[in-house]
Amino acid sequence: MGRLVGKVNNEHPGAAILEVGVWRGGTAGIMAQQLSVLKSNATIYLADTFTGVAKAGEKDNFYSGGEHNDTSQQIVEDLLQHKSQYPNYKILKGIFPDETAHLVPPNEMFGICHIDVDVYDSAKDVLEWVWNKLVTGGVVVFDDYGFHSCTGVTRLVEEYRNYPDRMVIHNLNGHALMIKLK
């Protein structure tokens, strides 16, 4: 993620980053650290309920809701303030986009969106909200694409794979990257 942040920030300086499904802040810390090294002023929006998985539904074979609730906003804030020391972040506590999207300025453009929500409906809602706010060349990273417990996310990515305005690739770590072409 650090290299991806560097590449996108180089092409689109100042483009914001959105992470939905922050859990304990590990990926947020990596991205913030990279932005700090780059002396960027991009805003990182970190959206999480801090109460576990939300919107689990019939397209998800493993999750029923509430899993991964062993976190808190304070854990994430401590990590960002003491480890990455990157000041330009905003925590959006609640279900995104339903409860917290209004906290993002309407003209904000994103270079990266990291979706780590584990379930179909939540991932779809985030993708549909962010796509028109993504810069050309921007990337949506689906953290859970290749995991047997996240079949809903795999299904979602496959549904969007052949749209002409994007390219989808995946790696051996289970991530899918959806790159906006136009």
Report each predicted region and the residues it spans.
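A short, well-structured juxtamembrane/interface segment
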Residues: M1-L4
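S-adenosylmethionine/decaboxylated-SAM
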Residues: G6, N10-K182
